[in-house]
UniProtKB/Swiss-Prot annotation:
Entry keyword set: Cobalt, Cytoplasm, Magnesium, Metal-binding, NAD, NADP, Oxidoreductase, Pyridoxine biosynthesis, Zinc
Subunit-structure text: Homodimer.
This protein's pathway: Cofactor biosynthesis; pyridoxine 5'-phosphate biosynthesis; pyridoxine 5'-phosphate from D-erythrose 4-phosphate: step 4/5
One GO cellular component, as annotated: cytoplasm
Reactions catalysed according to its record: 4-(phosphooxy)-L-threonine + NAD(+) = 3-amino-2-oxopropyl phosphate + CO2 + NADH
Signal peptide: none
Protein name: 4-hydroxythreonine-4-phosphate dehydrogenase
Keyword Oxidoreductase assigned: yes
HAMAP family referenced in this protein's UniProt entry, alphabetically: PdxA
Note on cofactor: Binds 1 divalent metal cation per subunit. Can use ions such as Zn(2+), Mg(2+) or Co(2+).
EC number: 1.1.1.262
Length: 333
């Protein structure tokens, strides 16, 4: 019987630092067995470019799960259409990048793996290839048939979830609705209990407008949308407070008594999180039937293949994925 979490790791955009940070794993203590999904030739070529001495072993579906072995990584080969060069995007390879996610979903559905960790992809080149793509979060939600998911970034004791994700700022206010906000808070509360083993999680909710609307003088979303949802959930004994002015919420006095923050939009919450824990933070998708974590950074094309990429966030993403699998098992999920 397999007891240790079985982790899948998609390599991401092959021209970026995804291959670099994945290869670094061969020299680190990992939380459990990891299977890479990507182009085997690309990984071998990048290892040569970086001067890394390791073994890359092909893995076929149906094989025993890879054992932990220092200096060895196992790869489920998903070939690229064109050879990969560090730092140079190629639209022809965009379908293969998405194929790694599809292959991972196949293994998860089959019960052959327990969690998915993703290295960064390049949204622009995928869209340039004629494939509509907003991001990992939305792609995996569609693949899982999950009507609503929540993006959470966590690092150095701070957890920040988002009420809206990849939207132009001009569209945010209209996207913050009572129904959507209630769903987001319920997903966040459940994840804090089941994935992070917090029995009574405490959540701080940010306002949308400066000064949380200043009593309606700087916007009505706090009074009309956010506060009623908070009050309703408080009536169910959930430990949720707000709406707080965002510049007040992100201060030590309030954060020390909180398990998570809900920000209304991407650039309200994530700049603080990344300033606090960049390179150590983990992106976690809540509301999926699978466990999915990712790094807190992008493809960094400018340093791909140079040896300057740091894999700290990826190591923490693997640790977090394994921890969530264990916590869900303990909770009977």
């Amino acid at each position: 019987m397999i007891t240790e979490p079985r982790l899948l790791l998609t390599v991401g955009e092959p021209a970026g630092i995804g291959p670099d940070i994945c290869l670094q794993l061969a020299f680190h203590a990992l939380p459990s067995g990891v299977l890479l999904i990507g182009d085997l030739h690309c990984l071998r070529s990048r290892a040569l470019t970086l001067g890394l001495s390791l073994r890359l072993e092909p893995w076929l579906e149906g094989n025993p799960w890879p054992a932990l072995e220092r200096g060895v990584l196992h790869v489920l080969d998903v070939p690229l259409a064109q050879p990969c060069r560090p730092g140079r995007l190629d639209m022809a390879n965009a379908p293969a990048v998405l194929a790694t996610l599809d292959k991972a979903m196949h293994l998860l559905r089959a019960g052959a793996a327990d969690a998915l960790v993703t290295a960064p992809v390049h949204k622009g080149i995928i869209n340039d290839a004629g494939i509509p793509f907003t991001g990992h979060t939305e792609y995996l939600a569609a693949a899982c048939g999950s009507p609503k998911v929540v993006m959470l970034l966590a690092g150095r004791g701070l957890r920040v979830a988002l009420a809206t994700t990849h939207l132009p700022l001009a569209q945010v206010a209209a996207a913050v609705t009572q129904e959507g906000l209630e769903g987001t808070l319920r997903i966040l509360h459940r994840a804090l209990r089941e994935d992070f083993a917090l029995s009574e999680p405490r959540i701080l909710v940010a306002g949308l407008n400066p000064h949380a609307g200043e009593g309606g003088h700087l916007g009505h979303e706090e009074q009309d949308v956010i506060a009623p949802v908070i009050a309703a959930l408080q009536g169910e004994s959930l430990r949720i407070s707000g709406p707080w002015p965002a510049d007040t919420l992100f201060t030590p006095r309030l954060l020390e008594d909180a398990d998570a923050v809900l920000a209304m939009y991407h650039d309200q919450g994530l700049p603080v999180l990344k300033y606090h824990a960049f390179g150590e933070a983990v992106n976690i998708t809540l509301g999926l039937p699978i466990v999915r974590t990712s790094v807190d950074h992008g493809t960094a094309l400018d340093i791909a293949g140079t040896g300057r990429a740091e894999g700290g966030s990826l190591l923490r993403a693997l640790d977090n994925a394994a921890e969530i699998v264990r916590n869900r098992r303990a909770a009977g999920c």
